[in-house]
Design a protein with these regions (language model features):
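Short, flexible loop motifs at catalytic/binding sites
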Residues: 1-212
């Protein structure tokens, strides 16, 4: 049975022009850091609190020519929040598939929980991402569907998790901890970037780690 109001809403949403705000400006306008995240600075996100993150987000914006952004900063800095901001901007402004790799299953589970909290806190994301109990779309620990795309959050330790997933945007957390050769099939970074071959003109990659 087709739910006509829902189909109509999706059609109208697809016809709206992209906002096309740079990631940092989108974040200042829409991103909310949930209290449940444990952050001491929860509430409305403000780039001014971490001004050194602004240039990174500018580079991740669609209209910036940079294709690959690499960051190495101290622990508990802006790395993952910037990736969350980029993901949120993707869902709201220019939806497409987003591949977000973690080095271990434990970190992937933690990231998925953080993504869920962010989606719940941000109105423009909550109304676009599938609900966990949705019958029409998927929202699991590793896969979260939204209007116009899907977020994939596998670990980097299995080549099978990287195969046959086209993705315009790729983020790799703690890239230095990823295995250098996944199931004897190659570097996980190269395997992930192979998923971007159909998006050569507008792909983006964000690799981040912390200083030891």
């Amino acid at each position: 049975m087709i739910c006509y109001p829902k189909v109509y809403d999706v059609l109208i949403e697809s016809l709206r022009p992209d906002l096309n705000l740079p990631v940092d400006e989108w974040s200042d306008r829409f991103m909310i850091i949930p209290k449940s995240s444990g952050s001491s600075e929860y509430g409305q996100y403000k780039t001014s609190r971490t001004p050194h993150a602004r240039e990174v987000m500018k580079c991740l914006s669609d209209d910036h020519p940079c294709k690959r952004v690499i960051c190495m900063v101290s622990s508990q800095q802006f790395k993952t929040q910037v990736a969350l901001n980029w993901f949120g901007s993707t869902v709201h402004q220019s939806p497409s598939n987003f591949l977000w790799l973690m080095p271990t299953g434990a970190l992937a589970k933690r990231l998925s929980a953080r993504v869920d909290k962010t989606i719940k806190a941000v109105d423009v994301l909550r109304e676009r991402v599938a609900k966990p109990n949705s019958r029409d779309a998927k929202n699991t620990q590793e896969v979260k569907e939204y209007i116009g795309g899907t977020l994939f959050m596998p670990t980097a330790g299995s080549a099978a998790n990287l195969a046959e997933v086209p993705a315009r945007r790729v983020a790799i957390d703690e890239v230095d901890r990823c295995e250098s050769n996944v199931d004897n099939e190659g570097d996980p970074i190269k395997l992930a970037e192979a998923r971007q071959t159909t998006f050569s003109h507008n792909k983006k990659s964000y690799y981040y780690s912390f200083i030891q």
